[in-house]
Amino acid sequence: MTRYSQPDALGQYGIYGGRYIPETLMQAVLELEQAYAEVKEDPAFRERMNDLLENYVGRQTPLYYAEHLTRTIGGAKIYLKREDLNHTGAHKINNTIGQALLAERMGKRKIVAETGAGQHGVATATVCALLDLECVIFMGEEDIRRQELNVFRMELLGAKVVSVTQGSRTLKDAVNEALRYWVKHVDDTHYLMGSVLGPHPFPEIVRDFQAVIGQETRTQILEKEGKLPEAIVACVGGGSNAIGMFHPFIDDEEVALYGIEAAGSGLETEKHAATMSKGEVGVLHGSMMYLLQDEHGQVTEAHSISAGLDYPGVGPEHSLLKDIGRVQYEAVTDQQALDALQLLCQKEGIIPALESAHAVAHAKELARGMQPEEVVVICLSGRGDKDVMTVRNALKGEA
């Protein structure tokens, strides 16, 4: 069997990915590609990063057998990969540590980033404080409203948070403005991309820094069960926690991989973020991928109760994995995610992020149809502290 090896030398995943960027950014992107190629071969860089992941972030994260959840649902054993236990409460810091060290090595002392739910913004502000880097975060006005506490956290950590009032005032627009800022300040600034999006080499860099999730999971499940899981489930917005979890398992064809998008109010409505179910191929933020578009090819607004999933595109590698059938992409509604969040709270005493609750919702249905000796692993990408007010308001609305 040919081993899976992506991207190609041009930074493409099949037809996806690439570099659709203005000339003003090309030099910075090529410089980043060169710097990344160098650090991949540098044991000292890896050693410093691993030291921070262990002693600052708190890795490795546990692979937890959710016994009560398993018993309640019936069917397969359910394990949770506890990325919610990382410093800052989500998987995002795996990537921000790596990229901030890379920026430091390139002599760039200023960092610009975008954030949706605020988790990437907090993780970026955190590592900038740690490494004494200047930090500017762009965030959509609508997301600022939803994630007020994360905005305060970023400011507390020394970041400047810029409200984006264009378009839908969410993640897509924050990326647009962050890219514009980078064009103007490219000489001394690194764009710290938060997901497996953007021009090459960003999707590859972010994937590689997040692959620690799947690498640890592989070792841990073999220790606990003596075999690989039958299925792995992760939520997909841009797709970084999912690709980090999936990538070390792609060549293991006996392991079914499920990426769960936000169906919002339902796939039959306009209010969803189900790019894989409803999208067409297009270009956004420097990369070719599946996108939510109207009949004129204009990018449409995505909707989800979860601020981290309402991106109208999806990473180029996910786009390829859909086409070749290696990952099955499904969608879960706001209501199903809320139900799953409550179930996990009540059965395991764990409040997941709304993003992660989408994965729990699908895994619940999956496990129910499986045998007791089979295993499902859920990537619990983040904790739900940031979402408590959103959940409270949603549940009040139901009452």
Curated annotation (Swiss-Prot):
CDD domains: Trp-synth_B. Its EC number is 4.2.1.20. Pfam families: PALP. Its cofactor is pyridoxal 5'-phosphate. Keywords: Amino-acid biosynthesis, Aromatic amino acid biosynthesis, Lyase, Pyridoxal phosphate, Tryptophan biosynthesis. InterPro entries: Trp_synth_b_CS, Trp_synth_beta, Trp_synth_beta/beta-like, TrpB-like_PALP, TrpB-like_PALP_sf. It is an enzyme of class 4 (lyase). The modification N6-(pyridoxal phosphate)lysine is found at residue 92. Signal peptide: none annotated. Pathway: Amino-acid biosynthesis; L-tryptophan biosynthesis; L-tryptophan from chorismate: step 5/5. It catalyses: (1S,2R)-1-C-(indol-3-yl)glycerol 3-phosphate + L-serine = D-glyceraldehyde 3-phosphate + L-tryptophan + H2O. One of its GO terms (molecular function) is tryptophan synthase activity. It comes from the Bacteria. One of its GO terms (cellular component) is cytoplasm. Belongs to the TrpB family. The beta subunit is responsible for the synthesis of L-tryptophan from indole and L-serine. HAMAP family: Trp_synth_beta. NCBIfam families: trpB. Tetramer of two alpha and two beta chains. This is Tryptophan synthase beta chain. It comes from Exiguobacterium sibiricum (strain DSM 17290 / CCUG 55495 / CIP 109462 / JCM 13490 / 255-15). The lineage of its organism: Bacteria, Bacillati, Bacillota, Bacilli, Bacillales. The gene is trpB.
